Structure formats: structure tokens, C-alpha cells
């Protein structure tokens, strides 16, 4: 059986699909389904552990040399003709073992955690879990052998979790799981030592998403975290915090700035609603309630872990994707929301006064892992969570007359792309993480 695609995205032309599956990056032609480019992360997932071991050995060697030299100096100073001193023999270094996760520890996966295109779509940027790196590829569709060329692999001190690019596409902005934000240049210069990297800004909580926004020609960094916060900081002078956006009660996992209004921020996470903000003015414009709409599609898999389960526990909502679309026929603005591990897509109309009207709920037969939108044609592509068959994708069309989502038959294209995906597994037990956003939710022991 085929492993589902974990992340999918398209370019603005709608001609190419970029996808991740396990430790593979794949690029497909959306007309023929042919594979145009591929990259496989061959770095062992134990690389960071081995690196820790090597660093510990270096420290021990330095300490051993210092102790040996000190012992020799002391012996020379205290040596007397009438007293024979015991020679100081340095003990061999005890090589530290590579740490091995104990029983019950979560498995270590080698997969691509995030994926985004630069604004000019000349570069593809991802995050590898194997060695805590950001990977940058140049894209050349004239290269018929492989359209992807890795130009930089930068290791970070802590595991990155989200990336964005500056407005001019010269810089990658990287958020990590320890609350720090870094920047690196988009170029072919060699990566620098991770110890030389300095954080641009920080949170006291784990970061979940990062975006670069612009207002009147000035750039800002927007960061969302596990502690319900959205921080708006100046860029590049990020030590100047403009303000915080307060309105969420649970973690923030998804930040979206639509092209049709770059002062508008749409945010979602572990709450039962999505927030609409004027991020520059620090105004909460409206909230989109989701509970009644999504409740029929929640299952027992959305309940809290057993140790936190009570009689009053609700099935939990986690936002995995927020998208927007402008109907070219009517100029109406649409908001699309995907909740994690559900078999539906919610579609809303966004009015000029920022009020929201629910247009439709598209129900499908399988849970959806990820969705992306071809802005040029209004075509949605969804990655399906299936355990049999080779039809890993499903296509939907926005009806520009009714603003509803409709399933379209592109089974031949889906099968061609699915066949080109060479990541085979024997059972679902071998799937890499498909649904992990809800793990950001904080739990109380009381």
C-alpha cells in the first residue's frame, strides 16, 4: 500500500504539485501526473544523537588534557630528593554511549515537517526532522531529469517547526519548538555552524507558525505559539514588539494572510472558532464558530487521551489548514477551513464588514490529511488518508455561480500521481505522523 502524502501545495499557475511523503519531496505535473522532481533525505535520524556523543567526547578530551597537565605541573613542584612521588597516570576516556530512547518513548521519525514556496516561486523551502535542518531548493522546470536542486541545508540548535520568507524573498524566517525565531539567507553560500546562529526574537512557549507581513512598506513578523498568543514584532528590528493579539484560549496552529487584504490575519488552532484580525491595528474583527458545523464529523479519536478523559470531556477541534479564495466571477471572498482528522471541508463567505456566512460543508469518504488550492482555477486538491488502493488524492472545484465545493472526477490524474509515489508500506502501523496538531494542546493533571 502507498503511504499518504503528508503535505501538499501548488504554485500560482496551478501546473505543479509539491508534496511530501515520509522523507521524500516530490514534484508532479498537474496535467499529466508525471514526476518532475524528487529529493530523498538520506540523513540518519540518529545523526543529532551521534553529534551529541561527539561533542561530549571532545569536552571529555579537553578536560582530560587539562587534568593531565595540572597533575604533571603539581608533581614537578612537589618532588623532593628524599621522597618518591607517585606518578600520575591519566585514566582513559570513558566514551559516552549514544542515548537510546527507553520503553514508551515516542518513535523518532525521519520526515519533512513543513514545506513552503518562496513568494516568487523560484525556491522550495522545507524542514527536516532528522537533523533539525532547513532545506532550500532552487526550482528549474527546464531540467527534465530533476527540477529540484538542493542549494543549502542549514542545521539549527533546536528543531524548527515553521518557515516563511521575507517580502523580497532574500531571507528565510525560521521558528523553532523552543520559542526562538532565526533568519538565514536564501543563497547558495555554505551553511554556517549552528552555534553561530543568533535568535531574532523569542517566546516563552513553543512556536507553531510564523508569517512575514507588510504594512505601508514596513515588514513585521507574526508568530503564533502554544500559549494562545500571537505576537506582532517589527522586522528586522524584532526587539521592538508592536503588540500582542489576544483572543484565543487554546494553542494557535495556523496563521493565514490573504492576498486580497494583507492587513487581515485569519488564525486558528485548538479553539472552537477561527479569529479574524486587523493585525496592524490590533483589532479582533470577528470570530467564526465551528463547533456546530464540525461536531457531526468528530469521532472518538478527537477525545482527550485516556488519562485526561472525564465525563464532561468534549471531542476536541484542531485547525490544520486555513485558505482563502476570491471568486473571479463575482469577486466574493471565500474562507476555507480544514479541521484535523476529519472527512469534511468547511466553506464560508467573507463579507466586506468581516461578517461570515457558512456556504457549505463538503463531506468526503476519507479523512483528509492536507488540502491546497489552485488560485488560478479554483480547484482544490486533498490528500486522503486511505489504507487501500492507489488513489491518494481527490479534486474539488469551487462553483463560481453558487460558491459551493463540488467533487470533480480526475481519477486518472490522481492514479498517475499516486503510482509515481514510491513510498510503500505494509500496514497503517508504518505510517509516519499524519495528525499531530492536537498534541499542542496543554493538559492539566488536576
From Swiss-Prot:
InterPro entries: Trm82 (IPR028884), WD40/YVTN_repeat-like_dom_sf (IPR015943), WD40_repeat_dom_sf (IPR036322), WD40_rpt (IPR001680)
Pfam families assigned to the protein according to its UniProt record, in alphabetical order: WD40
WD repeats: 107-147, 202-243, 247-287
GO BP term, example: tRNA (guanine-N7)-methylation
Main subcellular localisation: nucleus
Disordered: annotated span: 67-97
Compositional bias segments (type: Low complexity): 87-97
Family: Belongs to the WD repeat TRM82 family.
Listed name of the protein: tRNA (guanine-N(7)-)-methyltransferase non-catalytic subunit TRM82
Organism: Debaryomyces hansenii (strain ATCC 36239 / CBS 767 / BCRC 21394 / JCM 1990 / NBRC 0083 / IGC 2968)
Lineage: Eukaryota, Fungi, Dikarya, Ascomycota, Saccharomycotina
Gene assigned in the entry: TRM82
Amino acid at each position: 500500500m502507498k503511504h499518504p502524502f503528508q503535505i501538499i501545495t501548488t504554485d500560482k499557475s496551478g501546473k505543479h504539485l509539491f508534496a511530501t511523503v515520509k522523507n521524500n519531496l516530490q514534484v508532479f505535473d498537474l496535467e499529466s501526473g508525471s514526476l518532475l522532481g524528487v529529493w530523498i533525505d538520506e540523513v540518519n535520524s540518529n545523526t543529532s544523537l551521534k553529534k551529541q556523543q561527539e561533542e561530549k567526547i571532545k569536552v571529555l578530551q579537553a578536560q582530560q588534557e587539562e587534568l593531565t597537565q595540572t597533575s604533571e605541573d603539581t608533581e614537578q613542584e612537589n618532588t623532593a630528593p628524599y621522597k618518591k612521588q607517585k606518578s600520575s597516570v591519566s585514566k582513559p576516556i570513558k566514551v559516552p554511549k549514544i542515548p537510546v530512547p527507553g520503553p514508551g518513548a515516542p518513535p523518532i521519525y525521519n520526515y519533512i515537517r513543513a514545506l513552503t514556496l518562496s513568494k516568487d516561486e523560484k525556491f522550495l523551502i522545507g524542514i527536516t526532522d532528522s537533523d533539525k535542518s532547513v532545506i532550500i531548493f532552487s526550482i528549474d522546470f527546464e531540467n527534465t531529469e530533476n527540477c529540484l536542486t538542493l542549494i543549502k541545508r542549514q542545521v539549527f540548535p533546536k528543531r524548527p517547526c515553521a518557515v516563511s520568507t521575507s517580502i523580497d524573498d532574500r531571507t528565510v524566517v525560521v521558528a523553532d519548538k523552543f520559542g526562538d525565531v532565526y533568519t538565514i539567507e536564501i543563497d547558495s553560500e555554505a551553511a554556517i555552524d549552528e552555534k553561530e546562529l543568533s535568535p531574532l526574537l523569542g517566546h516563552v512557549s513553543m512556536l507553531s507558525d510564523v508569517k512575514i507581513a507588510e504594512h505601508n512598506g514596513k515588514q513585521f513578523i507574526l508568530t503564533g505559539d502554544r500559549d494562545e498568543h500571537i505576537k506582532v514584532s517589527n522586522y528586522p528590528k524584532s526587539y521592538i514588539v508592536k503588540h500582542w493579539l489576544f483572543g484565543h484560549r487554546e494553542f494557535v496552529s495556523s496563521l493565514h494572510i490573504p492576498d486580497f487584504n494583507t492587513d487581515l490575519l485569519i488564525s486558528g488552532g485548538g479553539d472552537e472558532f477561527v479569529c479574524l484580525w486587523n493585525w496592524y491595528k490590533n483589532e479582533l474583527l470577528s470570530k467564526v464558530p465551528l463547533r456546530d458545523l464540525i461536531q457531526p464529523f468528530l469521532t472518538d479519536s478527537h477525545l482527550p487521551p485516556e488519562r485526561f478523559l472525564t465525563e464532561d470531556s468534549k471531542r476536541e477541534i484542531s485547525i490544520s489548514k486555513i485558505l482563502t479564495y476570491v471568486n473571479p466571477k463575482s469577486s466574493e471572498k471565500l474562507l476555507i477551513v480544514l479541521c484535523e482528522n476529519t472527512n469534511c471541508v468547511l466553506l464560508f463567505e467573507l463579507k466586506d464588514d468581516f461578517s461570515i456566512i457558512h456556504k457549505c460543508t463538503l463531506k468526503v469518504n476519507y479523512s483528509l490529511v492536507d488540502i491546497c488550492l489552485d488560485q488560478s482555477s479554483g480547484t482544490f486538491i486533498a490528500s486522503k488518508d486511505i489504507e487501500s488502493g492507489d488513489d491518494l488524492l481527490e479534486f474539488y472545484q469551487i462553483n463560481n455561480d453558487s460558491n459551493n465545493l463540488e467533487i470533480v472526477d480526475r481519477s486518472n490524474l490522481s492514479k498517475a500521481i499516486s503510482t509515481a509515489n514510491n513510498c510503500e508500506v505494509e500496514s497503517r502501523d508504518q505510517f509516519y505522523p499524519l495528525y499531530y496538531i492536537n498534541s499542542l494542546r496543554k493538559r492539566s493533571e488536576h
